[in-house]
């Protein structure tokens, strides 16, 4: 199934049913009073998080959703039936944004969580409501209220504790395969991973966390190179970034330069995202002679001026991966405990998360608009070239 992490749709709640003007008519009661019923309420539109839904692909093909209109009232003070609600299911981790105002309508982070995005219109009033001491037979009634209309943007960000970061072919997919049950595609060419992959990592019994593998970045990603920064937003909900560095790239490139390029692209996309804790993993040690491994790794760390946590691994041979898992599990548990025990720390974390969400959203939208503008300019340039080529051609006139 195609992975789609953003969609713009329109939702329209149902209109309320109309009230009616009706009068009681029974045998021996020729002039009964008003008994017009009210109209039914229009159906509303809800969006609900669902664990069994993994992508927003359905909303790329069907973009308009409308709830049912309420039924009109009837005589004998019968209220019309309310319109059926519409419930749209989306993956857990979906943020709902009002396109016009930019306001966040809701953030669905739990299975079954539901948000109303368009409210159904109230039903109209029957003529019973307009009876008075001076007007015993009112013929007045009201029509139903229009249902709410909205254009909304659905943004999916995967929910993970740890996000993998690195160049294409650095071994991120091999690493997540080594430590979890996730089975992303693995090959010897760049951009094997085209969509985010999630894996549950079990450190010990009843101790686990979720790891996310996103497509690799290359230098210039912030300007749209490679797969660009489309998937970087999926790191916005993580607690820790795991920077995977290929110590012996197959293309002969410098691992130090590659690592610095990744950090640079991350800062360009979101300075706040770059403030997340980073754990460095020097991967693919099996590609280096054992006698030279330590010296080469130390050279990389010195050039990077790295002072944070670092691990040496071979995802292919499962060497050093368990140590990384235990370290990450300990760090995640410490963060969870602090948030539960220290309200001030929890408040700061929440503020940081809100700033990070807003920043990544703005950068993603700006990047997409820049990409569309670039594509439009390219198309216009191609059309101009075609026009010029036509002018240079020899004109042939057929005479009968």
Swiss-Prot record:
What species was this sequence derived from?
Acinetobacter baylyi (strain ATCC 33305 / BD413 / ADP1)
Task: Name the Enzyme Commission number(s) assigned to this protein.
Answer: 3.6.5.-
Q: Which gene encodes it?
A: obg
Q: Which residues cross the membrane?
A: none
Please state what the protein is called: GTPase Obg
The protein's superkingdom reads Bacteria
Tell me the ranges covered by the OBG-type G domain, including all copies: 160-333
The entry's keywords: Cytoplasm, GTP-binding, Hydrolase, Magnesium, Metal-binding, Nucleotide-binding
> What are the required cofactors?
Mg(2+)
Main function: An essential GTPase which binds GTP, GDP and possibly (p)ppGpp with moderate affinity, with high nucleotide exchange rates and a fairly low GTP hydrolysis rate. Plays a role in control of the cell cycle, stress response, ribosome biogenesis and in those bacteria that undergo differentiation, in morphogenesis control.
């Amino acid at each position: 199934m195609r992975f789609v992490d953003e969609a713009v749709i329109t939702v329209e709640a149902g209109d309320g049913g109309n009230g009616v003007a009706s009068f009681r008519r029974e045998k021996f009661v020729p002039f009964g009073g008003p008994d017009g019923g009210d109209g039914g309420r229009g159906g509303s539109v809800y969006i609900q998080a669902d664990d069994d839904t993994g992508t927003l692909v359905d909303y790329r093909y069907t973009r308009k959703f409308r709830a049912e209109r309420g039924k009109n009232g009837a005589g004998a003070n019968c209220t019309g039936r309310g319109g059926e609600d519409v419930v749209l299911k989306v993956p857990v981790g979906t943020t709902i944004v009002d396109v016009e105002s930019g306001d966040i309508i809701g953030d669905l982070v739990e299975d079954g969580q539901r948000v109303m995005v368009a409210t159904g219109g109230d039903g109209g009033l029957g003529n019973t409501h307009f009876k008075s001491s001076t007007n015993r037979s009112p013929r007045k009634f009201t029509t139903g209220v229009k249902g709410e209309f909205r254009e909304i943007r659905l943004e999916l960000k995967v929910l993970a504790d740890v996000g993998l970061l690195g160049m294409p072919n650095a071994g991120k997919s091999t690493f997540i395969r080594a430590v979890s049950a996730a089975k992303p595609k693995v090959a010897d060419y760049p951009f094997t991973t085209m969509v985010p992959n999630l894996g549950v990592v079990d450190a010990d019994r009843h101790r686990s966390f979720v790891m996310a593998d996103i497509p690799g970045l290359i230098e210039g990603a912030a300007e749209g190179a490679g797969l660009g920064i489309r998937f970087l937003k999926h790191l916005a909900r993580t607690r820790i970034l795991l920077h995977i560095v290929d110590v012996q790239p197959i293309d002969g490139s410098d691992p130090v330069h590659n690592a610095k390029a990744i950090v640079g692209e991350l800062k360009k996309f979101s300075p706040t995202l770059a403030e997340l804790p980073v754990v460095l993993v020097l991967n693919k040690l099996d590609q280096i002679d054992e006698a030279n491994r330590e010296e080469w790794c130390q050279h990389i760390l010195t050039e990077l001026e790295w002072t944070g946590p670092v691990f040496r691994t071979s995802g292919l041979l499962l060497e050093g991966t368990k140590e990384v898992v235990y370290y990450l599990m300990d760090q995640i548990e410490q963060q969870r405990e602090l948030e539960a025990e220290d309200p001030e720390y929890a408040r700061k974390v929440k503020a940081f998360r809100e700033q990070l969400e807003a920043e990544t959203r703005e950068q993603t939208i700006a990047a997409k608009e820049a990409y569309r503008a670039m594509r439009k300019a390219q198309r216009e340039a191609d059309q101009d070239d075609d026009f010029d080529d036509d002018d240079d051609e020899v004109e042939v006139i057929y005479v009968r």
